[in-house]
Amino acid sequence: MAKYAGIDISYCQPDVDYSALKSGKILGYPVKFVMVRAAYGTSMDKYFLQHVRGCLAAGLYVGVYLFSTAKNAAQAKAEAEWLISTIKANKLDGKITYPIAYDLEMESQYKLGKAVCTAMCKAFMDTIAAYN
């Protein structure tokens, strides 16, 4: 079974050499996929489109993630709807071949409790699943 590596990129990596990334290795494994940060809440990452298009042009598989700022399930669903709209508006339908992920890691969100965080994740993922 072949083994591959992947990375995540965002505004924190403004200058990416996508071709070098494609030919690079992580822990000896070739880089095959990249998870690109789409947004912080519903504010698009300023390098989202550049990163997605650069990775696709280099022949890398692309997934995206949304760094959530939601405080409840309705806001999480709105984040998912925003992401779907953004993907469609930028003609990325069918080009995102790796998962769409939900990044829930703000300390203030942990304080909401397990039930609320679970409901937020479910609302986001159910909305994404209906799109896919």
Residue ranges of predicted features:
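Substrate-binding cleft of extracellular glycoside hydrolase catalytic domains
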Residues: 2-125, 129-131
